[in-house]
Amino acid sequence: LKKGKDFYMVGGMGHASSVALGVNIAKKKVICLDGDGSILMHLGSLLANSINGNNNFKHILLNNNSHESVGSFKTNVNNINFKLLIKSLKYKNYFKLNKIEKADFIIKKFLQSKGPSFLEVIISEGTIKNLSRPKDLKSIKNKFMKSLKTN
């Protein structure tokens, strides 16, 4: 992550890919990190991403089958076949990472792909102890907006 070029969706769960799409439409390379709980909240944005995202739109799903940041409630996304969903929504590429030994290969292929591209990463439940949320949200927003204007 690059300071000022990354943007945290604090308190806006489900909106990360919509913000990423807006940046991407302006011809910027975008990598959106999303959680399974977040994606469930705005499934319709996946279609908007696939239709409007360009070759530089990359969407990563961190899938632990849990709303980790709000109490570890189950999302039950293990009942969703994301490969079928993503392909039916016309993303150009779908990748899945569920074995660490394949991480370098799959991530390289994902980043080199012409998008919109989607990578589902299967992760285990668990949070970092004492993980804090960013405090100065206005400053983060301003730095992010400034970086969009300069690049």
What are these regions (language model features)?
Residues 64-68, 126:
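A short, flexible beta-alpha/helix-coil linker loop
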Residues 73-109:
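Conserved thiamine diphosphate
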Residues 43-52, 69-85:
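Active-site-proximal loop->helix
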Residues 30, 57, 93-94, 116-117:
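Hydrophobic anchor at the start of a short beta-strand
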Residues 1, 43-44, 70-73, 107, ...:
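Short, well-ordered secondary-structure micro-motifs
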Residues 1-64:
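Thiamine diphosphate
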Residues 2, 112-151:
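Glycine/aspartate-rich loop-and-adjacent alpha/beta segment that forms the canonical ThDP
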Residues 14-15, 100-105, 125-127:
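A short acidic, often aromatic-flanked loop/helix-cap motif at beta-alpha or helix-coil junctions
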